[in-house]
Amino acid sequence: MKRQKRDRLARALSKGYQAGMQGRSKEQCPYFAIDARSHWLGGWRQAMEDRPGLAK
């Protein structure tokens, strides 16, 4: 049975979260499409909130 590919927007969110947890800048977002970019940035923002030791 073939495995379905994950939703592209869910993948963008996940990749953004991973980038945020690694401390990468939001300027390094690889997506140009508005929807994918906004999901990537949403994941990045969530990671910034979840990262320990960062005070704003």
From Swiss-Prot:
Which GO terms are recorded in the biological process aspect for this UniProt protein? regulation of translation
Write the record's keywords in alphabetical order, separated by commas: Cytoplasm, Translation regulation
Q: Does the keyword Cell inner membrane apply?
A: no
The record ties this protein, via Pfam families, to: RMF
Gene Ontology cellular-component terms for this entry are:
cytoplasm
Q: Which family does it belong to?
A: Belongs to the ribosome modulation factor family.
**Record's protein name:** Ribosome modulation factor
> To which species is this protein native?
Proteus mirabilis (strain HI4320)
